[in-house]
């Protein structure tokens, strides 16, 4: 059962903290019990950044499944020459070592890559 869905609101708001992964953590804290949060599985197209990984851990959300890693995204951004990430890239478990994490999912990498190219204003 899907309980919450969101997307990045950074481009439309100019607010670099408007990540969907952080919104998931905020929604879960307000709407789920601690037990429900612990049992929840969060699916994302990209690995959580440090801010989102911390939020996920602080509210006690369960397993994370991500399609592409932060390292993959950093490599693509470097290839496209669209600028560095505003924070250092770290795997989720470097920020929140007790979270259960699965990813990346290689068969989804090219779809996510195309999505990120478009969001960077580049042709697919």
Regions found by a protein language model. Name each.
Residues 1-10, 69:
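Short beta->alpha transition motifs characteristic of CBS
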Residues 9-27:
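A short, polar/charged loop-to-alpha-helix boundary motif
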Residues 19, 37-38, 59:
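Short connector loops at helix/strand junctions that flank enzyme active sites
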Residues 29-32:
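Glycine-/acidic-rich phosphate or pyrophosphate-binding loops and their flanking alpha/beta elements
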Residues 34-46:
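Immediate flanking context of iron-sulfur cluster ligation sites
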Residues 48, 55-124:
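Zinc-dependent deaminase
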